[in-house]
Amino acid sequence: MLALDAAPDGLVLVGGDGTLSGILDVVCAAGVPVTVVPAGTGNDLARALGLPLTDVAAAVELALTGLPRPIDIGEVRTSTGTSLFLTVAALAFDARVSDRTNRLRWPSGALRYYLALLIELVRLRPLDFTIRADDGPAIPARGTLVAVGNTASYGGGMPVCVGAVPDDGTLDVVAVGPLGRVRLVRLFPVLLRGRHLARPEVHHLRARTVTVAAPGLVAYADGERVGEETCTISVRAAALTVMTDAERRDAHVR
C-alpha cells in the first residue's frame, strides 16, 4: 500500500468488511490507528463499533476526534493458507449459500441470493462435525451450521453470534444442530431477533481457538471463501486499533 510508504500516523479506509479484511495483514503490521468509512453492503464491523453508517463526513471526522480502540481480529487456518477476518466466519449451510450465490450468473441483486438459498435448502443435508475448543477434546456433533464470531452480526445485521464483542479476547461459537428444511426456515425469524441462543437445537460457547472439521465443509469469513474441510479459527487479541466515537463506545461493550 502506497499510503504506508509515507509512514503515516493513521489510515482512513473506505470499504466494506470484505475489502477491509483483504488488507488486514498489511494494516495490522503498520501498527497505526485506522478510521473506517463504511462503504459495503453489510458493514457489520461498523455496526459493532457504533460507527456512522451513512454519514461519511462524520465517519472521516473520527480520524481527528475519535477515541483509539484496540479490537480483536480473527484468523482462519486451513490446508490452503491463512486468512484474516473482522466479523464472522460461517461454516456449512450459510457458507454454501454464499458459495452458490457467487457461482450463479443469474438473476442479479437480492434475487440471486434468494435463489441460492432455495437451492441449498433443497440440497440441505446435516454434516457430521468435529469441534474442538481451545485445549478441550474433539467433540463429534451432527449439525446444520457453525458460526464463529468476532462481532455479533454478519450479512448486514444478522445477529448470529449475539453478544459477541470485538475486544474481549475471545470468539463466540454458535452451532445449530441437525434441522430439516422447515425447522431451519422457522429458525430464521428467531435468529433475526437475536433470540436463538435459548433454543435447544442451538449451542453456544466462547473460546480463543476452535477447530471445526467435516466432510464437504465450506467456510466463508467477511463474505469471502476462506477454506474447506478443516478450519482452525483463532483470535488475535487487540491486533487492530480503530478510531471510534467516544460518546457511543460504552453502548457496544459487553
Regions found by a protein language model. Name each.
Residues 1-14, 21, 29, 57-61, ...:
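ATP/NTP phosphate-donor binding region
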Residues 104-112, 154-156, 161-183:
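Gly/Ser/Thr-rich active-site loops/lids in small-molecule metabolic enzymes
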Residues 133-135, 140, 165, 175-254:
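ATP/nucleoside-binding phosphotransfer catalytic cores, i.e., glycine-rich phosphate-binding loops
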Residues 125-127, 142-144, 167-172, 206-208:
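A generic structural signal for short beta-strands and their flanking turns/coil linkers
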Residues 14-16, 39, 150:
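Glycine-rich beta-strand-to-loop/alpha-helix junction loops that act as flexible
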Residues 90, 94, 147-160, 225:
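Glycine-rich phosphate/pyrophosphate-binding beta-alpha loops
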Residues 28-33, 39-144:
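Catalytic core of DAGKc-family lipid kinases
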Residues 94-97, 139-141, 153-157, 181-184:
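Short acidic/glycine-rich loop or secondary-structure boundary segments that cap or lie
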